[in-house]
Design a protein with these regions (language model features):
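A short, well-structured juxtamembrane/interface segment
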Residues: 2-20
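Acidic, Ser/Thr-rich low-complexity intrinsically disordered segments
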Residues: 205-225
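Structural signal for hydrophobic packing residues in well-ordered secondary-structure cores
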Residues: 3, 18, 43-47, 142, ...
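Glycine-rich phosphate-binding loops that contact phosphosugars or nucleotide phosphates
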Residues: 29-182
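Short glycine-rich phosphate-binding loop at a beta-alpha junction
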Residues: 22-28
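Internal, active-site/partner-interface "lid" segment
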Residues: 154-158, 176, 188-211
Length: 225
């Protein structure tokens, strides 16, 4: 059950943002950007999801360079200014460590602009000194931040004889959390008489046609559709 996640997007937020035509914007650096892809344009997923993709902060151009850039002060402003935000949008900002410059600064910029900000991070890193000029953790700049329970270093298994832990968990737990948040949002809106548009599989009868209508409606607001 996603019941324990219900307070994350309370009814007022759903009514004020989704029911007023807002988009849910999702941002993360490195592997955290995977959660933006997880929620975007997929069967069973919400239509009004607008991912924030900045390719140098992803992995396919240079994975090692993306790690360097995530710590660069001021880059968040460059990314933020590339985007067009609506007053009814909501930002979900993902960073397991929650200490690096770009995600923390980006969340702060969104908050300062009046957007409600939901974070997904690991509380295990709260004891670590922030690596940004703000001196803040992601938890400090979000309206609410959900613990993804990733251990320090992300890897969760330490087989006997191995020097280094293996099996990172933040993507798995993060995907569960973000889908839980969205499920609660849809459920609350439905209870209030508003049906959030949802994609269906393009491999079922009529699915492709239905999805095409959704993309036609949202294409101007979500360019990467």
């Amino acid at each position: 059950s996603f019941g324990s996640l219900a307070p994350i997007i309370p009814y007022r937020s759903c009514k004020h943002y989704l029911m007023r035509g807002g988009l849910i914007r999702v941002f993360g650096c490195g592997h955290s950007h995977i959660l933006a892809e997880e929620t975007f344009y997929r069967a069973g997923g919400l239509v009004p999801i607008s991912p924030i993709f900045y390719e140098p902060l992803m992995l396919h151009e240079s994975a090692s360079e993306s790690s360097v850039l995530e710590k660069r002060e001021g880059l968040a402003l460059t990314v933020f200014q590339r985007e067009s935000f609506n007053k009814n949008d909501v930002l979900i900002c993902v960073s397991t460590s929650g200490v690096n410059a770009v995600p923390v600064e980006f969340a702060k910029l969104a908050s300062d602009a009046g957007l409600p900000v939901i974070g997904i991070s690991s509380d295990e890193y709260l004891s670590q000194t922030p690596k940004n000029v703000l001196g803040l953790h992601l938890q400090d700049v979000c309206d609410v931040c959900v613990d993804n329970f990733a251990p320090h270093g992300d890897a969760c298994l330490k087989p006997e004889g191995l020097e280094t832990s293996i099996s990172p968990v933040s993507t798995v737990t993060g995907a569960f959390i973000i889908n839980g948040i969205l499920a609660e949002a849809v459920g609350i809106c439905h209870e209030r008489g508003y049906e959030v548009p949802v994609y269906v599989s393009g491999n079922i009868p009529g699915g492709a046609e239905k999805n095409k209508r959704h993309t036609a409606e949202y294409k101007l607001r979500i360019p990467c559709l």
